[in-house]
């Protein structure tokens, strides 16, 4: 509620034009502040809009500074609330600094300020008031305080220019414009005198164009600056030399091949593991050749008892290692299995070694060779368990194999020697040991013959001397008888 005497309204300047927007309170009467102590109340009528309009220009004239022009047009929206109304309402007031044309603010771009109104205090936001104590000031005190404020200089509650800040997702053009506006706003004339370094905080929301080092990539520097500089130069020079040498130098040589393993010329002395590798290498080449030939021709394989429905998951090398380890296969048995391949293919035209027949052939050939060449062998139950087939199926495979090879399962020893030499020659990682020199054997034989001849001559000499002695003894005996 505005409580001003009519006398103050008469002091209004006739040259000032003020536009006032007043929100009147409820028209219902309300008790005055000076109520009687015994419950007698008198009601003060609400001031009319005409009286309020006559009071506002007087108040606004007192608030204007000495530097303001004589005539101005000011819009003062004021919200008048009742004493027992809701929470304080923010009213829109004009700042004397913002309305000062000397600061360069156009009328349309004046910054907006808000002033809170305490409902309990019942004062007008346009009345002069000491905000430190909360007491109202008289007209003389208000004018003196205004003069002191003008003498000290106006204090702005916000900066004269707010730079346009951009968010983290702004484009490069917006960031560049924000940096330019910030530099223009913070530019100031350089004073004549000693230079003072001032730290200017960065504008929030604007990214700096200079690259910032990563905190994790920063390494502590030790030593004097000169040593640090020299060490950095040395490291950079070394890095450049290493890079140029790597680009211009020859390519690094490939890994050297391992030397071939030397095996004995007699297959009986060859280790089982090496013989398994030799046989697996030969079977791999044979399977690859037969599979490619079948795909080119496009003919369908004639099914045999050795065919599987699908390719087993174990490789030929691993399968051979399993058989040799758990079925106790010796080198002659392994070489006999290779011999059976040629014999079965020669006598059974529908059979070929491929990915579907190799596993069943190997377990069948191992069973037959162990029974035909070894003095001790396992039962078909154990062979079937090692080979991964049923006992009944292994029995059928064994009978089929014996019938196809015409029951001839014992190869000639010279044939096994020939197969062994062929396996070593086909595998690149193995070679046979050098043969023993024959000249040494011939010399030994000649020496033995010479020794035997010398022994024979000695025997002849002994025999001749004995004969002469016998003749002498016989002649002497004759002479005695004659006498």
From Swiss-Prot:
The similarity comment for this entry is: Belongs to the cyclin family.
Compositional bias (Low complexity): 1-32, 60-80, 176-200
**GO molecular function terms here?**
cyclin-dependent protein serine/threonine kinase regulator activity; protein kinase binding
Q: Which domain of life is it from?
A: Eukaryota
> What UniProt keywords are attached to this protein's entry?
Cyclin, Repressor, Transcription, Transcription regulation
Q: Where is this region: Disordered?
A: 1-112, 164-234, 434-483
Q: Point to the regions of Acidic residues compositional bias.
A: 435-473
Annotated Gene Ontology cellular components are: cyclin-dependent protein kinase holoenzyme complex; nucleus
Reported impact of residue 398 to Q: In ML178; loss of function
Gene3D superfamilies xrefs: Cyclin-like
* Physiological role: Negative regulator, together with pgov, of the transcriptional activator nuc-1, which controls the expression of phosphorous acquisition enzymes.
Q: Which PANTHER family match?
A: PHO85 CYCLIN PHO80, PTHR15615
This chain's protein is named: Nuc-1 negative regulatory protein preg
